[in-house]
Amino acid sequence: DSLSEDNWKFVVSSSCETILEILDIGGCAKGVAEYT
């Protein structure tokens, strides 16, 4: 389980810095995929 809750929060905050980016699921998922 390399992706702990804290790491996940970091990924989300880094990949989806704004509410609009969070709502942009495609962009958010792409950022998470690139991180992992």
Swiss-Prot record:
Its EC number is 3.1.1.4. Its main location: secreted. One of its GO terms (cellular component) is extracellular region. Its cofactor is Ca(2+). Heterodimer composed of a small subunit and a large subunit; disulfid-linked. Scorpion venom phospholipase A2 (PLA2) that impacts angiogenesis in vitro and in vivo without showing any cytotoxic or apoptotic signs. The antiangiogenic effect is independent from the catalytic activity and seems to be held by its small subunit. PLA2 catalyzes the calcium-dependent hydrolysis of the 2-acyl groups in 3-sn-phosphoglycerides. This is Phospholipase A2 hemilipin-2. It comes from Hemiscorpius lepturus. The lineage of its organism: Eukaryota, Metazoa, Ecdysozoa, Arthropoda, Chelicerata.
